[in-house]
Each structure stands twice: as structure tokens, then as C-alpha cells.
From Swiss-Prot:
Component of the ribosome, a large ribonucleoprotein complex responsible for the synthesis of proteins in the cell. The small ribosomal subunit (SSU) binds messenger RNAs (mRNAs) and translates the encoded message by selecting cognate aminoacyl-transfer RNA (tRNA) molecules. The large subunit (LSU) contains the ribosomal catalytic site termed the peptidyl transferase center (PTC), which catalyzes the formation of peptide bonds, thereby polymerizing the amino acids delivered by tRNAs into a polypeptide chain. One of its GO terms (molecular function) is RNA binding. This is Large ribosomal subunit protein eL13. PROSITE patterns: RIBOSOMAL_L13E.
């Protein structure tokens, strides 16, 4: 077996007929063709729906190390769907992924995904189940003629980077300790309840002493 990760480099002493036991991967080119054919078959099967699957939300990666990066998530929260005015059962039928476990921890993320859903609804073309009897909300015949299968990702996420002009670094910025400030803010948030409880107990003790 080939060495993996950061382990000890092996020094195996082969005595048996080891050439027979060598793991080979000669099936990879055929696998590549098989995967491609499967993708094409799926695209034909789900047409005219998008090839890449349903619409995904914009989420931030977890942990301090990666939370500056934005990527596509698993599904929209029930809160986001409610704010956008979309039923959670209907959402799955019109190509919107739903994740009931995810929670919105900020107003910004909620607003961004609600806006994404609303924009998606404006671009969406819904085919009637029965062509002779179109229901309310189904697209018109002119829109249906314009419909084509989307090959790329649905509403790709754009990573925007604001470029700042060169300027002189101020003395306050030089003295500012970013990591220490973040740690202090996290500590204050963590100890907020404990400190409030201690302050309340201290105030009660002062009142009792005065009596």
C-alpha cells in the first residue's frame, strides 16, 4: 500500500510473490467514459431542468479560519423560504433545495438568500403538467418556446473583492492588534452571562448588607 498522509515511511521487506499482489488502476480511462455517459444520460432524463441540480444558498464556511470565504450551501432554511413567500413543499418541485436543519445566525445571510430566491423566481420558467390546461403561475407559451437547458451552475456565486487605493498607514492601525481584539471579543461574548449573574449577585449582597 502506498504511503498516505504524514505517517512513518514504510520499509517493507517483500518475500512472497509480491508482483501478483500489486494494486492496479487500469480501469480509470473506461471509468471516465462511463461517468461522462452517465452525466449525459442524466441531462437527457431531467431535461429541460438544469444539469447541475437545484438552486443552492450562499453560505459562509465554518470556523475562524475559513469564515471570510463564501460558497454554495446544501439548502435554503425554512425561515428564508417563508420570507421569500415560497412553500417548503412547493420549493422542491420548482428546483429549490431545502435544508430544515440549517439556521440563520445573521440578518445579512437571511436577506442575501431571500433576495437570491426572489431573483430566481423572476427567471424561472414553469412548464404546465397538462399542456392543454395550464394552471395559475405556469409560464406562457412564448416563454416555454424560449426555454433551454442550463448546463452550468444555477445562478453562480460571484466572489466580490473590493480593491482599496494605496494610502498611508496611520499610527492607530499600526498599534491595533487584530488577533488579540478578536479573542477578546469572543471571550466577552462567552462570559457575558456569567459576568451579568455575578454583578446581579453582588448587587443583591450590597442591598442585604445595607439592611
Amino acid at each position: 500500500m502506498a504511503p498516505s498522509r504524514n505517517g512513518m515511511i514504510l520499509n517493507p521487506h517483500f518475500h512472497k510473490d509480491w508482483q501478483k499482489r500489486v494494486r492496479t488502476w487500469f480501469n480509470q480511462p473506461a471509468r471516465k467514459i462511463r461517468r461522462r455517459k452517465a452525466r449525459q444520460a442524466k441531462a437527457r432524463r431531467i431535461a429541460p431542468r438544469p444539469v447541475s441540480g437545484p438552486l443552492r444558498p450562499v453560505v459562509r464556511c465554518p470556523t475562524i479560519r475559513y469564515h471570510t470565504k463564501v460558497r454554495a450551501g446544501r439548502g435554503f432554511t425554512l425561515e428564508e423560504l417563508k420570507a421569500a413567500g415560497i412553500n417548503k413543499k412547493v420549493a422542491r418541485t420548482i428546483g429549490i433545495s431545502v435544508d430544515s436543519r440549517r439556521r440563520n445566525r445573521s440578518t445579512e445571510s437571511l436577506q442575501a438568500n431571500v433576495q437570491r430566491l426572489k431573483e430566481y423566481r423572476t427567471k424561472l420558467i414553469i412548464f404546465p403538467r397538462k399542456a392543454a390546461k395550464p394552471k395559475k403561475g405556469d409560464s406562457t407559451e412564448e416563454e416555454l418556446k424560449m426555454a433551454t437547458q442550463l448546463t452550468g451552475p444555477v445562478m453562480p456565486i460571484k466572489k466580490v473583492h473590493k480593491k482599496e487605493k494605496a494610502r498611508v498607514i496611520s499610527e492607530d492601525e499600526k498599534n491595533f492588534k487584530a488577533f488579540a481584539s478578536l479573542r477578546m471579543a469572543r471571550a466577552n461574548a462567552r462570559l457575558f452571562g456569567i459576568r451579568a449573574k455575578r454583578a446581579k449577585e453582588a448587587a443583591e449582597q450590597d442591598v442585604e448588607k445595607k439592611k
